[in-house]
Swiss-Prot record:
The gene is rpsM. It comes from Azobacteroides pseudotrichonymphae genomovar. CFP2. One of its GO terms (cellular component) is cytosol. Gene3D superfamilies: 1.10.8.50, 30s ribosomal protein s13, domain 2. Residues 99-126 are annotated as: Disordered. InterPro entries: Rbsml_uS13_C, Ribosomal_uS13, Ribosomal_uS13-like_H2TH, Ribosomal_uS13_bac-type, Ribosomal_uS13_CS. This is Small ribosomal subunit protein uS13. Disulfide bonds: none annotated. Part of the 30S ribosomal subunit. Forms a loose heterodimer with protein S19. Forms two bridges to the 50S subunit in the 70S ribosome. GO terms for biological process: translation.
Length: 126
């Protein structure tokens, strides 16, 4: 039986602890806490979960954590707020440069994007 939690299909043959990390906003540590609270062994494969266990995990996640679309939209709103108030981090977001003090003279290609080459100036002959 395919297990679907918050719009994400969990892989059937993975351990519960690993499979829950396929949900945006849940990492290894949080998945362990969720399974402990639900009373499910971390090493149990998803295909071996019962309907009651799936419902318990679903309920714990929806009650206690902000994940998937809600988390993505909250992050986007936080970035938009930074840009609107015009703080340093907001300005760096706006112009697409690193936010946390990294040097941009040589590297920062991930944030800056592909190189934009500038043609050399032609020398004037005397």
């Amino acid at each position: 039986m395919a297990v679907r939690i918050l719009g994400v299909d969990l892989p059937q043959n993975k351990r519960g602890e690993i499979a829950l990390t396929y949900i945006y906003g849940i990492g290894c540590g949080l998945s362990s806490k969720i399974l402990t609270e639900a009373g499910i062994d971390r090493d149990t494969r998803i295909k071996d979960w019962t309907d009651v266990q799936v419902a318990a995990v679903r309920e714990i996640i929806s009650r206690n954590f902000k994940v998937e679309g809600d988390l993505r939209s909250e992050i986007q709103l936080n970035i938009k707020r930074l840009m609107d108030i015009g703080c340093y981090r907001g300005i760096r977001h706006r112009i697409g440069l690193p936010l946390r003090g990294q040097s941009t003279k040589n590297n920062a290609r991930t944030r800056k994007g592909k190189r934009k080459t500038v043609a050399n100036k032609k020398r004037v002959t005397k």
